[in-house]
């Protein structure tokens, strides 16, 4: 029997339990009638239903487009009915009136109004992908979080580490109370099987025939678990839902038998299966226990029924039960319900003080109404501090170190408000989903007399809470004292919750508010409340900007905190500011540390265990570095953090386990010819990772010595690997990460903390499992991989090291030797200094800290270099791992008594700061020194072969796209010196000359925005993100695009002139396809280029603000501001300066003074929503759509004026038939108005109207120049030899033959030209001048030498062509070859 099958059995049973009884969510809200499931006369029960699936809006900030990896599924496609509860639940209460039926049915109407997204999601089975909709019946689906090779071998790769962890942070908070469903409607008067819970062997039978030998525990539709019955197969085979019994036989009974009879199954496997089965049965018994009486109803016959909420189930599983059934088993809960109904603490009976608060009186001892235990002295001080702030009408941050009982202090304070000050609420407490159980237990223990409700669950659950728990019957008076909810439901139901006037709002784990632009921050800021309290053990995690957000949330506008404090270069002003900030914040932040206030708490020690990498890890680590050699050497100069961060994430994965890379495990198993045996899989998991070898030895000893262990990792796939290892080793364990539903989390935590629990290990993700979870029954913490943020690791340690812990806590931090993990750990520790400098100490001079929470490119490079050189020297690592001695590693471990660390900090001790003094690694070595030349050459050769293959594939694809046309001869290669062979050059040419379809589309949009490349080359390539492409490639593609567009326009005009019946006003957009890019509007492109050319020519040189529109235009009507010729002129000036469509930049440009003329935020209308009258006063115009229309109209008016102006001044035609050149237009540019005397005719008066201006329009040339000037379009696409003289000071493209010749002649200085192109970015002014001088001098001398060796009749042409060729390599922007010659002459 394979390990996968064993895991399948365990997870199948888990899935059935989790889906059917804990995470239950009924997607449709529907109440119908049905009969009792039995003949005993038990009243049928009312069932409250759900309409909600997981809603992306629940998470506030945004939903990323990342692919989510779902756990593996087991699907039986043969069955038409699954083992899960049916979609439509029916039930009523005997004797209830029709009007009360209608009260519940009213929810149906709301369900029908749910958005289509939610409704469609409701049709999905649990765990299914919401994007796929189907009305067909779903096949049964199981969550297989323990099946090997499913989740951890997924193909999705995400190099963005923050986004990688964020996905699990988000999933951690999701609503996971789901119920897989059936779609078919059920007849009303029939019994229906909801879930098959269990089975038992009938006495006297051997179990060989399951359908005859077993009885099945059935939960009936619309009835609680209290009414489950044992039924033989024959009794239920004809009842609706009987297919679920067949599925249970196949997927539970037969599979269990198969595993037990398999000879490879161990006793540990069978024991684990039995333990899981017993745990499941215990949960079923818990579902029969009353959690809370929600409501009471008196029937017309005098009988009483109670609306019951059952333990571990949500409000949508509430059922109406007869008093005769409930009173014997829930007398305490009924009495609590009566006390709540008659409570003197009702909010309506409270006192409203407003802003005038009573005088503060210190609590000398614990009040009698604070029950549940005895507060420690420091906790009573915390209650007094919160009370003192309340009396002063101030807000504060309770920032005690993790594990000091911030929850207890907060609950005690709220109880103080209710009893001592008659502030009966309502109070709002917002907490993370994972801490809800802890808050519920604390509230029940320490404030049992307050009416506290948990606002959780799906749509129906929350609706039931609002209907029965929010208000006193028949009134709008608040009924509860305290509402406990999570961040997600605050966002989901902000419209409901924000309308309640809260007397006090407490927010747990408040560092979630560190981003002042988040939806959660915005929503909570709008809540109406008298006072606020933020609860966080880490008030400052990364930088002071986060603290500023928290303080501004508490006291808006009261403090102004700088977003950056540079502790590396302190000055007197900064020192004074930090002292002042510390003094001002001190009254509002209470922070105590364990060592100072809790002397009885056992100590905590941390040991860093360094371990060698395995051979497979070494292989991957070196390959990652070598394959990214080019990125490593270039990222510093280019300032690219993203590329380096990707490499860092990959190296961290290699440092943990090579199985984190796709396909590695399969390759290794094939290499050893594995048959998939248990011992082979286990050996691969352990021996291929140095950390796993160490962990295996460490866990063996800890198990023997009776310790219990928490293992933390950042990576969920790493938890998958650890889970497989623990299962194969037979170690009982629990798991909690962002993919585990909330209800299952609570069950797992309770099972681990239960007395005599068999669980040995608890696997947790650092981010999802490090918040507010109490696991103090463990005394050992293993941090498998350190977090970037040291506070996350401290949170993880605090799960075990907290009040109530009786044993010394040992923390083991696993670290791969000579890898980036060592440097990341040291750098992450430095972040802690800032917190103590601002929060605790007010330190001003000796400490160092990063300015922000993001690593720069230089820092990332230094991290990557740490230990990299040793990686290429290490040998025999696998032998070292096989011979590992645990005692020796523990003996040489680096010890840290972290309790003393923070204690020294709170007292302002110098010892604390000394412990953060680290030796900086000298990162002044180059990657050439680190990565051996042989390694680089090997991978360079592989890259070269791969590039050739890709180029060949691209050539084949391009040929098929273009109809197998030969590549145009004018498409010459970019200057490249990667090889000298003819075959290589052609492939390199093909690669350089082709832009991706996405790049071409961006180039098209940039030209629509800015016009021709001749005027705005830099703006266009920047907008299109083509700065890394060769200039002549971009020009060539742009020229081809313009040519294709002009041809399409000409053809369309010709067709239009031939078809006289065609109505011009009904013409459609002229869309063409260019190099695979579809929907390019040829007419718009040609027209825009022409219009912007005219606009550029009309713009004066004296400044954009001096431009005046030279013609009369029609005025605007109905705009919200005064708009006249000045505004039209400035709009055109803004288009010329910033581009067509850059309305935001135009509005904010102080030179144009259009700030009060453009209203982008006020209106976001479509073309059909432009107001035609003045009634719509709340929307101001012009908005973007109006500006587009006005801009197009003004450009057309300017074009028409230009055409008419040209017609009046016809140019003289020479005798040889050539048009005389235009005169200089300097005067016109200076005045901003056209000069009539200097204008010449550019087109015939009989020209056919066309959106495109004639291509023969010439640019003005110098007055002394007698040589004919080619048109702008001709010069852009020209392939013949240049005809302009050197005096013209312009560049003309070289043709293919000329470029090939120049490339050959300039080969000796190719390195200097490449340095000009690549090495100039990111340099300072001095370094740039030095580089340009060196390279330009060398290139110039070579050109002079080459020209001297050339025949005299060719010298001028060769000299000009070589300098023009050198222009291609000039950094960043275009330069004319004559300018290069001039610079070189000055340098000589």
Swiss-Prot record:
GO biological process: nucleosome disassembly; nucleosome organization; transcription initiation-coupled chromatin remodeling
Keyword Chloroplast: no
Residues annotated as signal peptide: none
Similarity-based family: Belongs to the SNF2/RAD54 helicase family.
SMART domains reported for this sequence: CHROMO, DEXDc, DUF4208, HELICc
GO molecular function: ATP binding; ATP hydrolysis activity; ATP-dependent chromatin remodeler activity; chromatin binding; DNA binding; helicase activity; histone binding; nucleosome binding
Record-listed ATP binding positions: 400-407
Function statement: Involved in heterochromatin silencing. Required for transcriptional repression at the silence loci of mat3, where it has a direct role as a chromatin remodeling factor.
Keywords for the protein's UniProt record, in alphabetical order: ATP-binding, DNA-binding, Helicase, Hydrolase, Nucleotide-binding, Nucleus, Phosphoprotein, Repeat, Repressor, Transcription, Transcription regulation
Motif window: DEAH box: 508-511
Enzyme Commission no: 3.6.4.-
All copies of domain Chromo, residue ranges: 191-260, 288-349
Domain (Helicase ATP-binding) ranges: 387-557
The protein, known as: Chromodomain helicase hrp3
């Amino acid at each position: 029997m394979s390990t996968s099958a064993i895991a399948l059995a365990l997870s199948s049973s888990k899935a059935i339990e989790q889906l059917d009884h804990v995470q239950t969510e009924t997607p449709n809200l529907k109440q119908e009638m049905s009969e009792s499931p039995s003949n005993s006369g038990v009243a049928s029960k009312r069932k409250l239903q759900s309409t909600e699936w997981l809603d992306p809006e629940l998470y506030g900030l945004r939903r990323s487009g990342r692919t989510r990896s779902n756990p593996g599924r087991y699907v039986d496609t043969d069955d038409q009915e699954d083992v899960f509860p049916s979609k439509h639940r029916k039930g009523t209460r005997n004797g209830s009136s029709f009007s009360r039926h209608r009260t519940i049915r009213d929810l149906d109407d709301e369900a029908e109004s749910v958005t289509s997204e939610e409704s469609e999601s409701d049709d999905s089975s649990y765990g299914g992908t919401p994007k796929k909709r189907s009305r067909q019946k779903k096949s049964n689906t199981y969550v297989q979080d323990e099946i090997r090779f499913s989740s951890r071998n997924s193909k999705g790769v995400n190099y963005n580490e923050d986004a990688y962890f964020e996905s699990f942070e988000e999933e951690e908070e999701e609503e996971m109370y789901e119920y897989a469903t059936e779609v078919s409607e059920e007849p009303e008067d029939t019994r229906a099987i909801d879930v098959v819970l269990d089975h038992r062997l009938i006495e006297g039978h051997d179990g060989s025939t399951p359908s005859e030998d077993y009885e099945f525990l059935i939960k009936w539709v619309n009835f609680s678990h209290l009414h489950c019955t044992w039924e033989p197969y024959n009794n239920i085979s004809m009842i609706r839902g009987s297919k679920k019994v067949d599925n249970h036989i196949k997927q539970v009974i037969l599979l269990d038998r198969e595993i037990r009879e398999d000879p490879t199954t161990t006793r540990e496997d069978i024991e684990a299966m039995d333990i899981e089965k017993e745990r499941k049965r215990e949960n079923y018994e818990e579902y029969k226990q009353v959690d809370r009486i929600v409501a009471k109803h008196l029937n017309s016959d005098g009988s009483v029924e109670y609306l019951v909420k059952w333990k571990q189930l949500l409000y949508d599983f509430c059922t109406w039960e007869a008093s005769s059934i409930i009173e014997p088993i829930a007398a305490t809960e009924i009495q609590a319900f009566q006390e709540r109904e008659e409570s003197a603490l009702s909010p309506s009976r409270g006192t409203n003080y407003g802003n005038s608060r009573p005088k503060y009186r210190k609590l000398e001892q614990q009040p009698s109404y604070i029950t549940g235990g005895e507060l420690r002295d420091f906790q009573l001080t915390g209650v007094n501090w919160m009370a003192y702030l309340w009396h002063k009408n101030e807000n504060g941050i309770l920032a005690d170190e993790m594990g000091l009982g911030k929850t207890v202090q907060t609950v005690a304070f709220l109880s103080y408000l209710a009893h001592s000050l008659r502030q009966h609420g309502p109070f709002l407490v917002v907490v993370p989903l994972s801490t809800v159980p802890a808050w519920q237990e604390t509230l029940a223990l320490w404030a049992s007399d307050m009416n506290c409700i948990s606002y959780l669950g799906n749509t129906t659950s929350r609706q039931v809470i609002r209907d029965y728990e929010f208000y006193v019957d028949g009134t709008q008076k608040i009924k509860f004292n305290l509402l406990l909810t999570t961040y997600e439901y605050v966002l989901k139901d902000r419209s409901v919750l924000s309308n309640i006037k809260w007397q006090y709002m407490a927010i747990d784990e408040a560092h979630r508010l560190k981003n002042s632009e988040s939806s959660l921050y915005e929503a909570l800021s709008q809540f109406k409340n008298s006072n606020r309290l933020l609860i966080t053990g880490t008030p400052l995690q990364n930088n002071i900007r986060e603290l500023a957000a928290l303080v501004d949330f508490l006291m808006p506008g009261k403090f102004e905190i700088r977003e950056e404090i540079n502790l590396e270069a302190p000055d007197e002003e900064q020192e004074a500011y930090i002292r002042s900030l510390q003094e001002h914040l001190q009254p509002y932040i209470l922070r105590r540390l364990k060592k100072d206030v809790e002397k009885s708490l056992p100590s905590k020690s941390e040991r860093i265990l360094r371990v060698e990498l395995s051979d497979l890890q070494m292989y991957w680590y070196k390959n990652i570095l070598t394959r990214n050699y080019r990125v490593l050497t270039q990222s510093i100069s280019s300032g690219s953090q993203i590329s380096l961060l990707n490499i860092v994430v990959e190296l961290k994965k290699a440092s943990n386990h090579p199985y984190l890379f796709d396909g590695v495990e399969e390759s290794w198993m094939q290499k050893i010819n594995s048959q998939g045996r248990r011992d082979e899989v286990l050996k691969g998991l352990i021996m291929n990772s140095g950390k796993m070898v160490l962990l295996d030895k460490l866990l063996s000893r800890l198990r023997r010595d009776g310790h219990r262990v928490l293992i933390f990792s950042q990576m969920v796939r790493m938890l998958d690997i650890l889970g497989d290892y623990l299962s194969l080793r037979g170690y009982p364990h629990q798991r909690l990460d962002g993919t585990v539903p909330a209800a299952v989390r609570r069950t797992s935590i309770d099972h681990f903390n239960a007395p005599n629990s068999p669980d040995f290990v608890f696997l947790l993700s650092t981010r999802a499992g490090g918040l507010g979870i109490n696991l103090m029954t463990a005394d050992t913490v293993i941090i498998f991989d350190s977090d970037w943020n040291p506070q996350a690791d401290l949170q993880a340690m605090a799960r075990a090291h907290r009040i109530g812990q009786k044993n010394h806590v040992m923390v083991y931090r696993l670290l791969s030797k000579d890898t980036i993990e060592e440097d990341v750990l040291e750098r992450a520790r430095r972040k802690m200094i800032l917190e103590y400098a601002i929060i605790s100490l007010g330190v001003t001079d000796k400490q160092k800290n990063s300015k922000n929470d993001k690593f720069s490119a230089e820092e990332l490079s230094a991290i990557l270099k740490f230990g990299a050189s040793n990686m290429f020297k290490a040998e025999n690592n696998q032998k070292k791992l096989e011979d590992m001695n645990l005692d020796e590693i523990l003996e040489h471990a680096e010890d840290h008594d972290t309790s003393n660390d923070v204690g020294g900090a709170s007292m302002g001790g110098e010892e604390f700061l000394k412990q953060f003094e680290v030796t900086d690694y000298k990162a002044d070595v180059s990657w050439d020194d680190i990565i051996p030349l042989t390694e680089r050459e090997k991978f360079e050769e592989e890259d070269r072969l791969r590039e050739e293959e890709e180029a060949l594939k691209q050539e084949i694809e391009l040929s098929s796209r273009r109809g197998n046309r030969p590549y145009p001869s004018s498409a010459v290669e970019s200057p490249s010196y990667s090889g000298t062979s003819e075959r290589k050059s052609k492939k390199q040419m093909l690669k350089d000359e082709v832009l991706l379809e996405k790049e071409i589309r961006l180039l098209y949009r940039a030209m629509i925005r800015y016009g021709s490349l001749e005027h705005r080359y830099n703006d266009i390539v920047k907008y299109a993100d083509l700065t890394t492409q060769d200039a002549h490639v971009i020009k060539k593609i742009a020229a081809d695009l313009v040519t294709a567009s002009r041809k399409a326009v000409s053809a369309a005009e010709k067709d239009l002139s031939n078809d006289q019946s065609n109505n011009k006003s009904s013409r459609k957009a002229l869309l063409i396809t260019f190099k695979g890019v579809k929907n390019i509007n040829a007419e718009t492109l040609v027209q825009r280029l022409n219009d912007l050319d005219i606009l550029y020519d009309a713009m004066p040189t004296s400044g954009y603000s001096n431009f005046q529109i030279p013609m009369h235009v029609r005025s605007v009507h109905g705009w919200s501001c005064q708009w006249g010729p000045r505004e039209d002129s400035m709009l055109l000036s803004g288009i010329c300066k910033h581009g067509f469509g850059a309305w935001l930049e135009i509005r904010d440009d102080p030179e144009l003074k259009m700030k009060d003329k453009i209203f982008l935020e006020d209106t976001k209308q479509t073309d059909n929503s432009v107001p035609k009258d003045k009634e719509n006063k709340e929307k101001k115009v012009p908005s973007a759509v109006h500006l587009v229309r006005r801009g197009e109209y003004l450009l057309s008016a300017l074009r028409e004026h230009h055409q008419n102006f040209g017609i009046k001044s016809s140019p003289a035609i020479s005798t040889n038939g050539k048009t005389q050149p235009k005169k200089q237009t300097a005067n016109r540019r200076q005045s901003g108005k056209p000069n009539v005397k200097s204008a010449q005719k550019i087109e015939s008066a009989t020209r056919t109207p066309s959106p495109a201006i004639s291509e023969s329009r010439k640019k003005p040339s110098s007055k002394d120049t007698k040589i004919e000037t080619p048109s702008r379009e001709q010069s852009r696409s020209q392939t013949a030899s240049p005809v302009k003289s050197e005096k013209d000071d312009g560049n003309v493209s070289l043709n293919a033959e000329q470029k090939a010749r120049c490339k050959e002649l300039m080969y000796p200085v190719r390195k200097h030209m490449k340095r000009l192109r690549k090495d100039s970015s990111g340099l300072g002014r001095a370094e740039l001048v030095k580089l340009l001088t060196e390279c330009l001098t060398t290139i110039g001398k070579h050109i002079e030498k080459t020209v001297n060796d050339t025949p005299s009749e060719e010298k001028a042409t060769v000299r000009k062509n070589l300098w023009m060729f050198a222009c291609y390599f000039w950094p960043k922007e275009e330069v004319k070859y004559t300018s290069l010659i001039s610079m070189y002459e000055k340098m000589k």
